[in-house]
Amino acid sequence: GEGEESAEPEKVYKDTPSTDTFVTSYYTFPDNFTTNLKGSKAFLQISVGVSTQYDETVIENVESHQLALRSEVLGAVSEFSVEQIEGKTGRDDLANKIKEAMNERLEELEGFGGVEGVYFTSFVLQ
């Protein structure tokens, strides 16, 4: 009879949005960054990675403008003193400053920043 068909709940398939939201892409700069800290003979050596949830274009831009972005990272680090980067809060502040500097430069070069996270894969203060 007609009532039998409705025993099975109807499956509704939702279209996946064309933008891959929440897919995070990462890029790690191949070489360390080493620079003096402000007002000190101490220097900081870091390895830096970045992340974005935008499309691959952001990572491609980071890669193709690596030289300009390295300069931005070194400039940002050299504005910090030893006291300012000690502890997790200091590292977070430094990461945010680097992110801002990278995005400003990418906006100049490509019209769009898109770097959402900056990570230190190594962090050595000497």
Locate the predicted segments by residue.
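Flexible, low-complexity charged segments
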Residues: G1-Q126
